[in-house]
C-alpha cells in the first residue's frame, strides 16, 4: 500500500490529502487502473473528523478503490478556501492517475456532514472558470465523476446546521444564503449517491430530501437511502467508528451503505 501525505494547499494553506492506495509490487500481478474516492470528512467547518477519514478510506481500499482523505482548512478560514483545496485534491488525483494507478474517469468525491456540503459545492461550481483558474487547473480536471454524500449539510434554511454555515462564511448571513446546495444544482451536477438516517437531529434528513428533489427536477441520476435509526455522524456505523459513548452510532442496517454505494457506482458505468 502506498500511504503518503500530499500537499494540496492554496495560497499558503496547509491542506493535504493522505493516500491509501494499492501499489504494484514485484511479486504481484500488474494492477489495472482502479476507481478512486476522495474522502472529505465532516466537522461543521470547525474541525476535520478523524472518524470519517482513515477508517472510511481503509474500508474503500478493501473494496477495490484507491482512497484519498482530504484534510482541509476550517474556521477561522472562510469560503472559498476549503473548496479550492478540494478542487486541487481532485486535480492532483486525476493528474497523477498513472502514479496512483487510478482510472481518471472514475473519481468519486465522498463527503460527510459539512464535508458533504463542501463536496456539493464542488458539484455545482466545478465548471465555473474562477474556481479552476484559482488553482491553475481546468474545469474538466476538477470535476467529480460521481458524488457520495453521507448525512450532508445542504440547506441553510429551516433544516440548517447553522454552525456549519457560520464557520464557513464567518457568520456572513447573506453569503450563507447563496450557498444552499439545493438552490444551486444545475445540469452539470454529477450523479449522486445519498444516504441519511431518519433520526438525525443535528442535520435533519430533509437536507438529503431537498437535494434529491433538486436532482430529480434537473434529471440528474441519484440513489437515495434513508435508514430508520441512527444519530448524526454515524460514519461506518460500527463500534470502531462510533463517537465515544455513542451506542446509537452502531447500526447494523446502516453498515451496508459502502457496498450499496459501490454497487451503484459500478452499475452506473
What are these model-derived regions, one by one?
Residues 33-42:
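Short beta-strand element of the alpha/beta-hydrolase
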Residues 213-269:
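C-terminal catalytic histidine-bearing segment of alpha/beta-hydrolase fold enzymes
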Residues 188, 194-196, 200:
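Short beta-strand/loop motif that positions the catalytic acidic residue
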Residues 201-210:
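Conserved alpha/beta-hydrolase "acid-adjacent" motif
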Residues 1-32, 162:
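N-terminal cap/lid segment of alpha/beta-hydrolase-fold proteins
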Residues 48-50, 70-104:
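Catalytic nucleophile-loop/oxyanion-hole region of alpha/beta-hydrolase
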Residues 91-164, 176-177:
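Primarily recognizes the serine-hydrolase "nucleophile elbow" in alpha/beta-hydrolase
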Residues 31, 50-68:
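Short amphipathic alpha-helix adjacent to the substrate-entry channel of hydrolases
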Amino acid at each position: 500500500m502506498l500511504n503518503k501525505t500530499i500537499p494540496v494547499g492554496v495560497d499558503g494553506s496547509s491542506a493535504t490529502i493522505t493516500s491509501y492506495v494499492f501499489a504494484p509490487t514485484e511479486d504481484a500481478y500488474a494492477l489495472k487502473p482502479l476507481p478512486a474516492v476522495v474522502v472529505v470528512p465532516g466537522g461543521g467547518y470547525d474541525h476535520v473528523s478523524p472518524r470519517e477519514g482513515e477508517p472510511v478510506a481503509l474500508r474503500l481500499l478493501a473494496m477495490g478503490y484507491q482512497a484519498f482523505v482530504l484534510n482541509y482548512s476550517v474556521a477561522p478560514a472562510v469560503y472559498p478556501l476549503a473548496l479550492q483545496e478540494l478542487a486541487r485534491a481532485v486535480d492532483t488525483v486525476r493528474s497523477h492517475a498513472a502514479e496512483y494507478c487510478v482510472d481518471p474517469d472514475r473519481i468519486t468525491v465522498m463527503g460527510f456532514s459539512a464535508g458533504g456540503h463542501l463536496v456539493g459545492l464542488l458539484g455545482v461550481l466545478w465548471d465555473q472558470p474562477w474556481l479552476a483558474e484559482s488553482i491553475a487547473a481546468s474545469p474538466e480536471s476538477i470535476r467529480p465523476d460521481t458524488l457520495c454524500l453521507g448525512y450532508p449539510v445542504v440547506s441553510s434554511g429551516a433544516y440548517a446546521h447553522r454552525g456549519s454555515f457560520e464557520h464557513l462564511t464567518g457568520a456572513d448571513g447573506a453569503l450563507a444564503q447563496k450557498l444552499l446546495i439545493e438552490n444551486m444544482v444545475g445540469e452539470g451536477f454529477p450523479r449522486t449517491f445519498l444516504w441519511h438516517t431518519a433520526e438525525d437531529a443535528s442535520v435533519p434528513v430533509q437536507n438529503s430530501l431537498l437535494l434529491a428533489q433538486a436532482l430529480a427536477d434537473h434529471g440528474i441520476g441519484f440513489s437515495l437511502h434513508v435508514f430508520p435509526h441512527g444519530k448524526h455522524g454515524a460514519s461506518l456505523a460500527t463500534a470502531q467508528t462510533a463517537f465515544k459513548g455513542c451506542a446509537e452510532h452502531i447500526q447494523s442496517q446502516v453498515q451496508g451503505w459502502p457496498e450499496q454505494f459501490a454497487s451503484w457506482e459500478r452499475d452506473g458505468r
